[in-house]
Amino acid sequence: MISHLHNTTVSAINKELSNLAAANGSLSSGRVLTLVVLAEKGHSREAMRAAIRASHEHPSRIIVHISHDPLDPDQLDAEIHLGGDTGASEMIVLRGWGSASRPTEALISGLLLPDSPIVVWWPHSVPENPAQHSIGRIAQRRITDSARAEDPKEALKHLAEVYRAGDTDLAWTRLTLWRTQLAALMEQMPSSPVRRVVVWGSGKSPSVVLLGTWLGWKLEAPVHLATIGAANRGLYRVSIEREDGSVTMFRPGIS
């Protein structure tokens, strides 16, 4: 079920949401968090699909804000998605012009679920300081993606400088499988001093830097980053050089 509201207000959106929920037999009390997605015009569909997939495991209220021209007259349009692809979740898509093009606490707060955690996600850009952003200040978790920045390594470095508890970057999340497999591999091997760690990957991938830093800290060994220019390769090989020989883990199909 999808309802479209043109040139509307937060109050009218809430009223329509209540009417749809009553007609659909839906209760917001079953939702565990509010996910606020701050998307860019022309790139929002992929972010919405990802948010819906995530909400299948954690029923949520998803609020997607899409910025349009800030110089246009003030206008707020909304779509309310209930049921169907959203499953047990609900999604409110806001399109803002003029003053409504800026995602602020004043604009979003009236749509938040009461007494539930707030997660904010920037899928296409990296804010100057996530914890000081108008919505970042009220969120318990702030998710960025430094890989989307023009200079991912510099973006990651800056995020580290302004880090506050609750900040998360997807460059670290993408390393979950690598870290799990490497830890399991090292646990199975006899103890031997590590001479050096080499991490191969794209020179633009912040995950390469993060994994190298993590391994150097955990193994107390020097790290060499063997970076290349091809951004689409990402992280593809790790070699741990020990006194009793080398251990290598790599992505199949990539040399």
Spans of features found by a protein language model:
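An N-terminal, globular interaction/scaffold subdomain
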Residues: M1-V120
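A generic structural motif
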Residues: R61-P70, W121-P123, T144-A149, P222-N232
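Acidic, Ser/Thr-rich peripheral helices and adjacent loops at domain boundaries
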Residues: D77-G84, G136-R148, S239-G253
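Internal, hydrophobic cores of structured domains that mediate oligomerization or house catalytic pockets
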Residues: E90-A183
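ATP/pyrophosphate-binding catalytic subdomain of soluble kinases
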Residues: L170-L225, R233-G234
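C-terminal structured domains
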Residues: K15, L20-N24, G212-W214, H224-S255
